[in-house]
Amino acid sequence: MRMLMNVRFPHEPFNTLVKEGTVGEIIRRILDDLKPESIYFTEQGGTRGAVAVINVDDPSRIPSFSEPFYLNFNADCEFRIAMSPEDLGKAGLDELGKKWS
């Protein structure tokens, strides 16, 4: 199943890591381990952020996705299960509508 992981980086320690020249290597190490389907870095509420699409085969792996961001950046992580159009088609919405209407 696919999951969206939203990451918000506080200014510190990120700014210090940028000044030290180590932030790039830390992010590379995390991404090498995370292996996201895709990831985009952006601004979120005035701070740095990222949105990743991750394939989750085993829910017990979720801490391994977020802990590197928590421990290296004091970041906040949010998770949302995501469906493709094909997944949504398999959801049986018509039947659910009939059952619960």
Where are these regions (language model features)?
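Conserved, structured core segments of small domains
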Residues: 1-101
